[in-house]
């Protein structure tokens, strides 16, 4: 008899207009108002990892004999809907729109400031 495994239903993927290296501001949660750089995007989970935001402590066991265990502080992921792209020049967070240039290339533009990102 097969054992039952608990698998969560697949989440519906949202269009993330965030890339690695973008500066974002947290708009909800305990770290609301903090800004940081996107270290990694997890598009299948609709999550991002932001530098210096949503820090978690983890206890690591020693791997070799004679080595001591340690406590590691690292960033945990945030849902992509809880962050907004941040303009460092104008110091304001804004939604993003996709525009098509005359040559056919697609760029991202901040709606509040009109600043083109890519």
Curated annotation (Swiss-Prot):
* A biological process from GO: translation
What PROSITE patterns does this protein's entry cite? RIBOSOMAL_L24
Concerning InterPro entries, the annotation shows: KOW, Rib_uL2_dom2, Ribosomal_uL24, Ribosomal_uL24_CS, Ribosomal_uL24_KOW, Translation_prot_SH3-like_sf
Q: Where are the transmembrane segments?
A: none
Query: Which keywords fit this entry according to its UniProt record?
Result: Ribonucleoprotein, Ribosomal protein, RNA-binding, rRNA-binding
Provide a GO CC annotation, any one: ribosome
One Gene Ontology MF term: structural constituent of ribosome
Pfam families registered for this protein in UniProt: KOW, ribosomal_L24
Q: Which SUPFAM superfamilies match?
A: Translation proteins SH3-like domain (SSF50104)
* Complex and partners: Part of the 50S ribosomal subunit.
UniProt cross-references to PANTHER family, sorted A to Z: MITOCHONDRIAL RIBOSOMAL PROTEIN L24
| HAMAP family in alphabetical order | Ribosomal_uL24_B
The record's comment on protein family reads: Belongs to the universal ribosomal protein uL24 family.
Question: What the protein does?
Answer: One of two assembly initiator proteins, it binds directly to the 5'-end of the 23S rRNA, where it nucleates assembly of the 50S subunit. One of the proteins that surrounds the polypeptide exit tunnel on the outside of the subunit.
Which protein are we looking at? Large ribosomal subunit protein uL24
């Amino acid at each position: 008899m097969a054992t039952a495994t608990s698998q969560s239903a697949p989440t519906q993927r949202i269009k993330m207009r965030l890339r690695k290296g973008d500066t974002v501001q947290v708009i909800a949660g305990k770290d609301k108002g903090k800004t940081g750089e996107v270290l990694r995007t997890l598009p299948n989970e609709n999550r991002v990892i932001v530098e210096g935001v949503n820090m978690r402590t983890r206890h690591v066991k020693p791997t070799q004999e004679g080595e001591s265990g340690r406590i590691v502080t690292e960033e945990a992921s945030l849902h992509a809907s809880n962050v907004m792209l941040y303009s460092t020049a104008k110091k304001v967070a804004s939604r993003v729109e996709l525009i098509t240039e005359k040559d056919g290339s697609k760029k991202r533009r901040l709606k509040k400031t009109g600043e083109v990102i890519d």
